[in-house]
UniProtKB/Swiss-Prot annotation:
The lineage of its organism: Bacteria, Bacillati, Actinomycetota, Actinomycetes, Mycobacteriales. It holds the Pfam family HATPase_c_3. It comes from the Bacteria. Keywords: ATP-binding, Chaperone, Cytoplasm, Nucleotide-binding, Stress response. Residues 568-648 are annotated as: C. GO terms for cellular component: cytoplasm. This is Chaperone protein HtpG. HAMAP family: HSP90 (MF_00505). It is found in: Cytoplasm. The keyword Transferase does not apply. Belongs to the heat shock protein 90 family. It comes from Mycobacterium ulcerans (strain Agy99). Homodimer. The keyword Nucleotide-binding applies. Residues 354-567 are annotated as: B.
């Protein structure tokens, strides 16, 4: 065979990131072994599943295991598995992971990380834990052969900007990673990773629960053989293969028998995370459907939380046999950040995603898991408000997706949700908190949507609400534009957008019915003329009760699609036209009063054209005030420049 040997360079950003790894962005260098063993465990899981599905794959799965081998003389440490292995193309793709678009962002965040824990968390989030090997090694060699393939691949790098990759023969199935260790340096927390006791300690600490045996050849002293009655001879040193981990399923043990450290390490293994979880949820169901579940709510959101192609975090086992690693049928999409394990007792091992979609037991488990996670979040909200606030900051955006899809749990989702509001700049509010603060004459929960808090607060739609002291929820995330269209009320109180439909804010008697009727008569000609002048740009022109400072604003019908929502739909490839909107005028504003007088007195073509242009400018400023743009920006700019010129 002609070996294909290539020497390649890391991309510039990847090289800088690798340099950060080599120079130890965090002090707990022991974590490298956990990452290598976790990768090996994944490879064994994948082989067992592939052998089960592909009967033509001729592999021996009777003794799947992980080995660690230390060579004190050569100062090397090897972690080896007989799992699925990788092809040359897959190895190249693995290297490419380091150079994907998120690298620059990660590099910046690593430099800004305030402590070791923050750095560990970031490394785990971006899935580059393999490269933590360079914290303890001057050179890393990877040898791998894919199950069912004859050609193996060798990858090697010293982390200095280049790596080599070549095709080789004669390698065993699976993957081995050999680290050429750096010299010991206690000050830099570089220990002797060839020492049996150190490896035992790290494997027990980080990987005791791994489902596959982790083996190591250890030296043992045994007495020399001797006859009975004779003095024993000198002890001899023999090598014995020892299994270093207990392989006990953590979820099958009573919660009070599992330490917090054990839960934390198990979470880091299954989630490929480097930080501790925020909450542990242990469940056991007996009866019609028997299953055990161990779920974790992370402390931080993973970087691909909003990537629809990202894998889910729930592993499915049947009678402690691994079935699949990203079972999206066990948790709704809006809880995709939850990590964990579900071990069912009565399900067929011959299971596929298509079968799962129809499985009654899976649907029942999903319902129970969902309710348990939501009740746990509710407990956080009431018992640990600081943790809840962190949770909502990290995951609130995706949890609110459930308001659209999960009707059965909608009330609970509304209860656990938090929103910014005009009540406080610092503290978000729950809907229950909002209802408690409602004024006596208030019957609706008012909200406003927009791109930012600052933009919403400057919107003319809020003026009368602010003047009357009504609290308004400030909804600034894209999902908010969507869920408010399907959630009509909370606790019997209707939800009302300040920018949709008609609102009556004069019901307290400040503006009498007679006064409003008089205003209507006074402005009737202007309203009709504006509707005719603006034509297809507006559905209606009317007087407003929601404006106190601005001359005009645009209102969407109660059940209409807002421009912001239409932009969201268009971004997803859906062309949704925005219906015509209503122009509301402030009858007390000098511009509106002046326009009424100018329109009434326009008695020649020049004056009529001037007031028509003023009408266009008024409509354009209403669009700008809400964060939109005029339909014809060039025309608007021309009219504005002309009007400004006349004032000079």
């Amino acid at each position: 065979m002609n070996a294909r040997v290539e020497q390649l360079e890391f991309q510039a950003e990847a090289r800088q990131l690798l340099d950060l790894m080599i120079h130890s962005v965090y002090s707990n260098k022991d974590s490298f072994l956990r990452e290598l063993i976790s990768n090996a465990s994944d490879a064994l899981d994948k082989l067992r599943i592939e052998a089960f599905r592909n009967k033509d794959l001729e592999v021996d799965t009777s003794d799947l295991h992980i080995e660690t081998e230390a060579d004190k003389g050569a100062r090397t440490l090897t972690v080896r598995d007989n799992g699925i292995g990788m092809t040359r193309a897959e190895v190249v793709d693995l290297i490419g992971t380091l150079a994907k678009s998120g690298t620059a962002e990660l590099r910046a965040q690593l430099r800004e990380a305030k402590n070791d824990a923050a750095s560990e968390e970031l490394i785990g989030q971006f899935g580059i834990g393999f490269y933590s090997s360079f914290m303890v090694a001057d050179k890393v060699e990877l040898l791998t052969r894919k199950a069912g393939e004859s050609e193996a691949t060798k990858w090697e790098s010293s982390g200095e900007g280049t790596y080599t990759i070549e095709s080789v023969e004669g390698a065993p199935q699976g993957t081995s990673v050999t680290l050429h260790l750096k010299p010991e340096d206690a000050e830099d927390e570089l220990y002797d990773y060839t020492a049996d006791w150190k490896l035992r300690h790290l494997i027990k600490k980080y990987s005791d629960f791994i489902a596959w045996p982790i083996r190591m050849e250890v030296e043992k002293r045994v007495p020399a053989p001797h006859e009975e009655g004779e003095e024993p001879g000198e002890e001899t040193v023999v090598l014995e293969t020892e299994t270093l981990n207990s392989m006990k399923a953590l979820w099958a043990r009573p919660k009070d028998e599992v330490s917090a450290d054990e839960y934390n390490e198990f979470y880091k293994h299954i989630a490929h995370a480097w930080d501790d979880p925020m909450e542990v949820i242990a469940m056991k169901a007996e009866g019609t459907f028997e299953y055990q579940a161990l779920l974790f709510i992370p402390s931080h959101a993973q970087h691909d939380l909003f990537n629809r192609d990202a894998v889910f975090g729930i592993q499915l086992y049947v009678k402690r046999v691994f079935i699949m690693g990203d079972c999206d049928q066990l948790m709704p999409e809006y809880l995709r950040f939850v990590k964990g394990v579900v071990d069912a007792q009565d399900m067929s091992l011959n299971v596929s995603r298509e079968i799962l979609q129809q499985d009654r037991q899976i649907k029942a488990i999903r319902r129970r898991l969902t309710k348990k996670v939501l009740s746990t979040i509710k407990d956080l909200q009431s018992e640990r408000p600081e943790d809840y606030r962190t949770f909502w900051t990290q995951f609130g955006k995706v949890v609110k997706e459930g308001l659209l899809a999960d009707f059965d749990n909608r009330e609970t989702l509304l209860e656990i949700s938090s929103f910014a509001s005009t009540h406080s700049e610092e503290e978000p509010t729950t809907l229950a908190g909002y209802v408690e603060r409602m004024k006596e004459d208030q019957t609706q929960i008012f909200f406003a949507t927009g791109d930012s808090r600052q933009q919403i607060l400057k919107s003319p739609h809020l003026e009368a609400f602010r003047a009357k002291g009504y609290e308004v929820l400030l909804l600034t995330e894209p999902v908010d534009e969507v869920w408010v269209g399907v959630v009509n009320e909370f606790d019997g109180k209707p939800l009302q957008s300040v920018a949709k439909g008609e609102v009556d804010l004069d019901s307290d008697g400040e503006g009498s019915e007679a006064e409003r009727e008089e205003q209507q008569k006074e402005f009737a000609d202007l309203l009709g003329w504006l509707k005719e002048t603006l034509g297809e740009q507006v559905k209606e022109v009317r007087l407003s009760t929601r404006l106190t400072e601005s001359p005009a604003c645009l209102i969407t019908d109660t059940f209409g699609i807002t421009p912001a929502l239409a932009r969201i739909y268009r971004a997803t490839g859906q062309d949704v036209p925005v219906g015509k909107r209503t122009l509301e005028l402030n009858p007390t504003h000098p511009l509106v009063i002046g326009l009424r007088q100018a329109q009434a007195s326009a008695d020649d073509d020049a004056k009529k054209e001037a007031v028509s242009e003023t009408a266009e400018l008024l409509y354009g400023t209403a669009l700008l005030a809400e964060g939109g743009a005029p339909d014809d920006p060039a025309r608007f700019a021309e009219l504005l420049a002309d009007r400004l010129t006349r004032t000079l």
